[in-house]
Amino acid sequence: MFWIKTTLYQYLTQKYGQIQPPADLKAVGSPVDEAEYACPDPDTFPDDEPLKRYEEGNSMVGMKQDILYFLNPLAAEPCYYQVDLDSKAFMAYAKQIDGTPNTVLSAIMLKMVSRYFSIKKDQHISAKIADDYRKDIGCGKSYRDFVRFIHVKYDREMAEESIEKLSQRARGAILLQMQPENSFEWYRRVAEARKGIDEQPNLRSRISYAQKHSLYKSDARDTYTVSYVGRTDWGGMADYITGVYAITDGNLMLEVNALPDKICVTYQVFDRDSRPLDLFLQILQEEKLPYTVSERMVRYMPDLQLPKPKAKHNITQGTFEK
């Protein structure tokens, strides 16, 4: 995000003149502080056990869609919708029920899923919520990818509860799993996986090792995902931005960004069926939350091929070896 801001700031100032920069703007040519690429040493972490672990197992609700897509991606047409929520109204609603954007959207998605899928009595629905844990491990200024997922389990019968009650359930699960001990444990696993990748002799074997030992591959399977890691400071650039939408790869996945006047939701699905979106909007209407929504848009993901490195890259330390 740092360099997206820099590029956008360059473009806007060249076009419109001087604009108040965000506090964390990285100017072209400015020195890179060591803290910006910091990587922690897991051996320095305390060995305390977390109070809460997620051991509830996978959610089978919606898995058929995911499996069919990954078996034959060409048979589907991944798409997304831009849903804009009025920031003032949404945050007032969240405050009134003692919720957060993550917990409120998780509760709304639960109700949507319960109306969309035929859920068996013994099945449960679970939410995956992104957690930026860089501060827990002492790397608050680092722009490395320090994100893990928190899981919130709901029983089928809970879908009849109010958004307020469901939001409280989600918040309780989030608070327990956001303990620093969970972050220490997760990063130890990350460091171990990276060490294994670095030990491989060539790029092909590194890719193979990474695929077989992916931490997310062994993580719990959830019904839907909500990814909101906080409001971004755009400075004076916010006056020129009409929306911020992150496009990723996932089904029933909400990527959420915030501007001063609106919360921008990228509502992503694997196919052209509009019912998941329609039900989501229906619940917004029931809760009297104002919104606007775009037409369906095809989700094109970049197909990148990395160049062959001239030196061996150590991903654990972020360095190249001769």
Segments from the language model and where they lie:
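Non-catalytic, low-complexity flexible loops and terminal extensions
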Residues: F2-A89, L284-K322
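Generic alpha-helical secondary structure signal
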Residues: F2, E49, D84, K88, ...
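Acyl-group handoff/entry surfaces in thioester-processing enzymes
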Residues: M1-V32, M91-Y93, E185-R189, D239, ...
